[in-house]
Amino acid sequence: MSEQTIKILVTAVLFLQGVAHGRAFFALLYQSMGRLPASWLPVRSWLLPSLSAKTVAGVASIFWLLSTLGFLAMGLSYWGLLLPPDLWSQLAVPSAIISTLGIILISGIWPGAPNRQLAILDTVIALIVNIAILVAQLWLHWPPQ
């Protein structure tokens, strides 16, 4: 695979991860304001089950906002657009960890998903991307500097 093809694929994955987290962030924002559409699954915390869904959504929205900004900045940086090209690798590990913590803290329910199957699918895809980022950065040290 050519270097340009890899660059396009990695940038696309980072942007899609950012957009997916952004969509989830807005779903959490709606839920924290008490505007949860009937078709969306409410988020809950296994760690603090006594918290209301609105409170959990408010707390979780912080994780998703930070993840959204991190993944979108990573995509811009990796592509070399508006941000220094080496910035993406500095954002990679923190963004993936914040995203993973957010997913774990709210029981793996992807915010804004219309049903449990899509919530699980969205969650699994996000976790796979997060794990791939962590493995690439921490274990493989990719891309080489």
Q: Where do the PLM segments sit?
A:
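Membrane-interface extramembranous regions
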Residues: 2-145
